[in-house]
Regions:
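Structured catalytic-domain cores with a bias toward divalent-metal coordination
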Residues: 2-175
Length: 175
């Protein structure tokens, strides 16, 4: 009987170690951010919660980079990172933040529009969690490669099946 307790404790200890290691990995992804270096054209950095206070402190809150021209003019909004696994939109917005200069009007840039999607990825699809880019100066920059969808932790409970207005049954994560 004593052998069973020892075996059970050994298995329990192994499970606890595994859970701690994997939990730490998930926590690091959930709190990770990449470095975005605002260029000289950025006149202000705001948060989306400045416009909708209920977002403050949630994964939906994200930075808005404002580039104000010296002359009056129109306004333009650039949304990057709508799908965090599509690097083109995110990287395009980052390039604007780091390099653009506005002469007239105002440019608003949100590199991480779906901020929650950057807090997880699709591991069963073989996606990396980060992408590394070497700059001309030889520095390596790291960017997060997230998921197309919002993190399930931020939208739970999500229905298993959703029936749309036409009566079609869809996976709860696809609506």
């Amino acid at each position: 009987m004593k052998k069973n307790y020892i075996s059970a404790l050994a298995v329990l200890a192994c499970v606890a170690v595994f859970c701690t290691i994997s939990g730490n990995s998930f926590h690091q992804m959930r709190t990770a951010t990449e470095e975005i270096i605002p260029g000289e054209g950025v006149t202000e950095v705001r948060m989306l919660s400045d416009y909708f206070p209920d977002l403050a402190g949630t994964a939906g809150d994200t930075q808005i980079y404002v580039l104000q021209g010296e002359q009056e003019g129109g306004s333009c909004l650039i949304l990057g990172g709508t799908h965090a696994n599509e690097l083109g939109g995110h990287m395009g917005a980052v390039l604007f933040v780091e390099n653009a200069k506005v002469e007239a009007g105002t440019l608003y840039v949100i590199p991480r529009t779906n901020n929650s999607a950057f807090t997880h990825n699709d591991p069963q699809e073989g996606h990396p969690s980060t992408v590394h880019i070497t700059t001309d100066e030889g520095n390596v920059r790291e960017f997060i490669h997230g998921s197309r969808a919002t993190n399930p932790v931020d939208q739970w409970p999500d229905p298993d099946v959703y029936v749309n207005y036409m009566g079609q049954s869809l996976s709860g994560s696809e609506n």
